[in-house]
C-alpha cells in the first residue's frame, strides 16, 4: 500500500475520493490538492584509518538482520548532513566533522504495510578510530569490513546496494 491509498475521503471537506489511489490526491468537490513527495534519508560510507568500511547489522525492520550503512531519515527543518551526523551519533556513537557528498538514489521503504518513496543522499566520511558505542534498538552488530569482502547480497536496501556498488567500482579504479 502507498500513502496515497490511505486517503479514501478528502482530509479538508470529507467527501469521498473520486479516484482513490491517485497521486497527487485531488478532491473534485473542494479542489483540495495533496502531493506525496518522497521522504529524505541520508547514509554514509565511513572509512577507518585501515581503510575498512563500517557496516551495521539492522536490529529492527524493515530488513532486520541485514547490513547497511549508518544513517536514517531527515527531520523537518534539518539538512541532510546534520541529520546524518545525528543518526551516526545515535547509532554508533561517532562524531564526524567532514562528510563529502557521494550520490543520491531513489528507494522504496516498506514499513508496517505501507511503501514509502524515499530519496537517499549518500556521503563519504573518515573516522579516526574504530571504537563505537551502539544503540541496541537500532544496531545489533557493527562490522568493519574490507572493501573486497563486502557482500552486496547481504545489504538491506536497493539504494544502499547500488551506492556501495558505485563506491566499490570507484575505489578499485
Task: Report residues per predicted region.
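Active-site-adjacent beta-strand/loop module that shapes the phosphate/pyrophosphate-binding cleft
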Residues: 103-131
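Residues immediately within or flanking Cys/His clusters that coordinate Zn2+
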Residues: 5-9, 24
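Short cysteine-rich clusters marking metal-coordination/redox-active sites
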Residues: 10-13, 27-30
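NUDIX/MutT-family hydrolases
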Residues: 133-164
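Short Cys/His-rich "knuckle" micro-motifs
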Residues: 18-24, 36-40
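Conserved N-terminal beta-strand and adjoining loop/helix that marks the start
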Residues: 29-53, 73
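A short coil-to-beta-strand element that immediately follows conserved catalytic motifs
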Residues: 20, 95-104
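Conserved Nudix-box catalytic region and its N-terminal flanking loop in Nudix hydrolases
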Residues: 48-90
